[in-house]
């Protein structure tokens, strides 16, 4: 069984929540919950409110996502 394709979105972190979770406003205006990927945790990349990020989301649940990249300015 093949793994489903993930959908990528760009957005901006609007709020930092407890337990390494974030509220992200997407470029199209929707707000979603997101968590940082294992690579970001392993390399200790900090994500703050106002950072631009790239999210991966499942096409089946577009309310949650995984942050896989923090843009530099």
Curated annotation (Swiss-Prot):
Keywords: Cytoplasm, Initiation factor, Protein biosynthesis, RNA-binding, rRNA-binding. Residues 1-72 form the S1-like domain. It is found in: Cytoplasm. Coiled coil: none annotated. Belongs to the IF-1 family. One of the essential components for the initiation of protein synthesis. Stabilizes the binding of IF-2 and IF-3 on the 30S subunit to which N-formylmethionyl-tRNA(fMet) subsequently binds. Helps modulate mRNA selection, yielding the 30S pre-initiation complex (PIC). Upon addition of the 50S ribosomal subunit IF-1, IF-2 and IF-3 are released leaving the mature 70S translation initiation complex. This is Translation initiation factor IF-1 2. The gene is infA2.
